[in-house]
Each structure stands twice: as C-alpha cells, then as structure tokens.
Amino acid sequence: MNRITNLFQTQKDGILSVYFTAGYPNLNDTASILKALQAKGIHMVEVGIPFSDPMADGPVIQEAATQALRNGMSLHLLFGQLREIRSEVQIPIILMGYLNPIMQYGFEKFCASCVEAGVDGMIIPDLPYADYIADYKEIADRHDLKMIMLITPETSEERIRLIDAHTSGFIYMVSSAATTGAQQDFNEQKQAYFRRINAMNLQNPRLVGFGISNKATFEAAIAHSSGAIIGSKFVQLLKSEATPAEAVDKLLEALKQ
C-alpha cells in the first residue's frame, strides 16, 4: 500500500507534514534532515526540488532554493540520496517541485525514479489540473504515485470537486492565494474558507499549508483538516540551528507557543 494512503488510514487527524528544500543548507543534508524528522515523530515529509524561479514561494524558500542550486543540488543527485536513505526512513516522502525541472528530466523517467527511490507522491504547484488529467495522470497512476493538487480560497467549487474525484492521497488546502511564509494567525475570512471546504464533504482528506508557524495557526489548521504542512518556518530553523535535530525541536516548541 502507498505510504500516504496508509498514513491517512491509520492517523485521522493531527498530522504534521514538514517541508524542506533538498540541498539546503548543505548539499548532503537530505539524509540527516529526514532521519531527524522521523525520529521526532513527524508524520510525513515534503522534499522541495530547488528551482531558479519558485513563483509560489516566499523569500525564505526562494533563498533556500537559490542556495541549494549553488550547492550543486540536482534531481539526479536527490534521487541518489533518497535511494540510499529510504531503508532507514519509513514515513511517506513527497517530492514538491515546479514543472520545468521535472519536464527537463522527463516525466515518465521522473516517476520511475520516484518509485526506485521510495517516493510516495508529488506536488507540482504550476501543473494545471486540465494538463494533469490529459497528459500526466495515467503515468502517475501506473507508478502508484499520488499527485497532490492545491486548492486556494479562489478555487471554484466545481474545480475542487473535480480534483477530489480524480486525485487521491490528500488535498493541499492553501491558506491564502499569496506566497508561502509565516503568519501570526488565520483571520475569520480564512477560517470561513476552511469551514466552507469542510462542508463539501470531500472524499479525500485535507492538509492546510502556507503560513503555519505557531500554536495559533497550527491549532486552526488541525481544527479544520486532518493536519498541517509547515515549510518556511522549518527552513528558517535549518539555517539558524546547529543540527537538523535541533531545528525540529525548535519547530515543535514553536507550535506550542
């Protein structure tokens, strides 16, 4: 069974998924970060594929992507790192990246490499839903890779229902249409959006991402979904703390404050 499917079958709520950029802060940090996240009880990991024009990301992840590329990170290298560490890491791993580097690698080859490396799913923020259905879904399904699609407060109910019907794993509920980055709290407008999506009774579980960095935003996310995705906050901590384990500890502390 796909590890993402298994996670949502065994853990119905309070799921914490953490994002980091491959190759940041150092080229060969992937294994130590993954092991630290698993050791501290993180349920799922999103590994970012660095790209030179990350349009959905805020300044923290943009800077991390730039540094990772300078460090020499590539898809070929990342797949090698994941293959080496997979036997020691049991939690689901999702690759998150923009379409350009994936297409340069070749989508069919990308999916095959994901399977070899033990990757369970992918998030491609700039892949339009219609293109996914027409050109990518059959290939991803053949490799048992979950394609996780994003929805925002601006996504129509019709589109949300189509995404729910034609994808599996979970739906990535973006807290706002802006870029990633920390927020102090989710205002009433955002919480109304969360409630509206809940009222649709979708078949897929949902995780809330973008802007989660403290107790208030984390608790709001898990109150309205199966869990939360944290990225920018953890990427900042990887830079400021001495080790990945200390960065995870600081992250978990922040979610209690």
From Swiss-Prot:
<feature type="active site" description="Proton acceptor">
    <location>
        <position position="57"/>
    </location>
</feature>
<dbReference type="GO" id="GO:0004834">
    <property type="term" value="F:tryptophan synthase activity"/>
</dbReference>
<keyword id="KW-0822">Tryptophan biosynthesis</keyword>
<dbReference type="InterPro" id="IPR011060">
    <property type="entry name" value="RibuloseP-bd_barrel"/>
</dbReference>
<comment type="pathway">
    <text>Amino-acid biosynthesis; L-tryptophan biosynthesis; L-tryptophan from chorismate: step 5/5.</text>
</comment>
<protein>
    <recommendedName>
        <fullName>Tryptophan synthase alpha chain</fullName>
        <ecNumber>4.2.1.20</ecNumber>
    </recommendedName>
</protein>
<keyword id="KW-0057">Aromatic amino acid biosynthesis</keyword>
<keyword id="KW-0028">Amino-acid biosynthesis</keyword>
<comment type="similarity">
    <text>Belongs to the TrpA family.</text>
</comment>
<keyword id="KW-0456">Lyase</keyword>
<dbReference type="InterPro" id="IPR018204">
    <property type="entry name" value="Trp_synthase_alpha_AS"/>
</dbReference>
<dbReference type="InterPro" id="IPR013785">
    <property type="entry name" value="Aldolase_TIM"/>
</dbReference>
<dbReference type="GO" id="GO:0005829">
    <property type="term" value="C:cytosol"/>
</dbReference>
<feature type="active site" description="Proton acceptor">
    <location>
        <position position="46"/>
    </location>
</feature>
<dbReference type="Pfam" id="PF00290">
    <property type="entry name" value="Trp_syntA"/>
</dbReference>
<comment type="subunit">
    <text>Tetramer of two alpha and two beta chains.</text>
</comment>
<dbReference type="InterPro" id="IPR002028">
    <property type="entry name" value="Trp_synthase_suA"/>
</dbReference>
<comment type="function">
    <text>The alpha subunit is responsible for the aldol cleavage of indoleglycerol phosphate to indole and glyceraldehyde 3-phosphate.</text>
</comment>
